Amino acid sequence: MVQNIEAACGEFALRHGGCCERGIRNMRRALLAILALFFGLAIALPAQAQDKQDKLVVSIWGGSWRDLVAETVAKKFTAETGVVVEFITGGTIDRLNKEKLAKGNPESDITFTTSHVGWLYANDGLFETLDLAKIPNAKNLADEARISPFHIGAWAYVYTIGYRADLLANMKFESWNDLWKPEMKGKIAGPDFDPSHIIAVSAILSGSDAAHWEKGQDKLKALKPNFKAFYTNDANSQQLLASGETPVQIVLSMNAYYMIGQGVPITLVIPKEGAVLGVDTVAVMKGSKKAELAYKFINALYDADIQAEIAKLKKGSPAVLNAKIDPEIAKLPGVFTTAAQWKQQINIDAKLRAEKTAEWRKWFAENIMN
């Protein structure tokens, strides 16, 4: 190539009656620089491709949830495999909608989501059917954490009654029925984004169940005067309880324990009918090119020590029954360490919930929130 350029430059000199030795030297230097850059890229590109290949992409909620997984299972996974974990964060439904648009070429390799929204992924063909033989630690899962052939529980919590005992003299909550007491008028808050908990409770108190939720409609309508507000997110829930504006809440247990840690004097109870069980789940995305790594990640998630650490950090229930939990954590209301404790809770079928959520939200907004 150098010789060809020199020849061309020589021809130029002949044609135009001048000499281009300096031009030849300059062009030779430029050519050598280009060749060096070319060979550098040739070496760097495979390394970059390898770097990209050695990443596992995990979709999860942001904030403390992302940090929870990063500091526990992702840390263990990277130490064992050398593979870096990259996170995509966002809201539950936003992430679902993005994966629908990317169907067949998923943005992530692994997704964490709620048990019922997981069914929306599965019904749309977005999750792989799990090969549990590749997740040996899953043998220790609680039965209630085995959500479907496509997604399984990562940890659990409850929605239950949390209240400010300092603002409610001599008030006790031993049953969900206590929310209907006349003295509760204008004191209760619940989530505006998911009424499934109180809908299921109302059906049970009416002698039915979530599948036949209509039988609890009159019961739930009778609770309407006792609602003061409906919170839109965790921060709003915290503000309503901390200020005392709503001294009673249908509250996420993990959120309540966070507030207690911030100095808000909340009492959390498990009614005699049981609290409403919630399970966050994990799944492998269909079309992922890192499925084998994804299975290793999920297996690391179910390591007994990792599950115990998650329980400690979030004050939630480990999904596996062999985790050794700090006794101070294990005794907290809403933290379950035995199969019997799991079974004592109100467990709304996740597939039913996925099918009914839109209908429930519409009915609740029209009949209770307006």
Predicted segments with their positions:
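Bacterial N-terminal signal peptides
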Residues: 33-42
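Early extracytoplasmic/lumenal segment of secretory-pathway proteins
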Residues: 51-119
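Extracytoplasmic ligand-binding site segments that recognize negatively charged/polar headgroups
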Residues: 61-70, 107-245
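A ligand-binding cleft/hinge motif common to bilobed small-molecule-binding domains
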Residues: 117-122, 242, 247-265
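Periplasmic-binding protein-like
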Residues: 157, 218-223, 262-286
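A bilobed periplasmic-binding-protein/Venus flytrap-type ligand-binding module shared by bacterial periplasmic
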Residues: 160-167, 203-206, 278-291, 309
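Mature extracytoplasmic/periplasmic domains
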Residues: 285-345
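Conserved C-terminal helix/tail region of periplasmic/extracytoplasmic solute-binding proteins
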Residues: 340-370
